[in-house]
């Protein structure tokens, strides 16, 4: 499975998360995953909720349309974006 996969109702992303970064950004490929840096610490689900909020802004969807399918407690996650309104250039480059 690749880092970004299209499905019938959106995108499935395989992510590697770097918590406590200096800024929120999509870094690029990290092996066969997309590396995402977020400022939140990995404590009490703060990083997960911050990741959902960040991805919602990047894809211009509501937080309820961003679902963490796998990896709630780890750095390696599988996230589904339902009906993205916009695809960030870093992700668009990987889907071609």
Curated annotation (Swiss-Prot):
Quote any Pfam family the record assigns: DUF167
Annotated SUPFAM superfamilies: YggU-like
Q: Name one GO cellular component term.
A: cytoplasm
Q: Which domain of life is it from?
A: Bacteria
Entry-linked InterPro entries = DUF167, YggU-like_sf
What's the family?
A: Belongs to the UPF0235 family.
PANTHER family (alphabetical): UPF0235 PROTEIN C15ORF40 (PTHR13420:SF7)
* Protein name as catalogued: UPF0235 protein YggU
What is the species of this protein? Salmonella arizonae (strain ATCC BAA-731 / CDC346-86 / RSK2980)
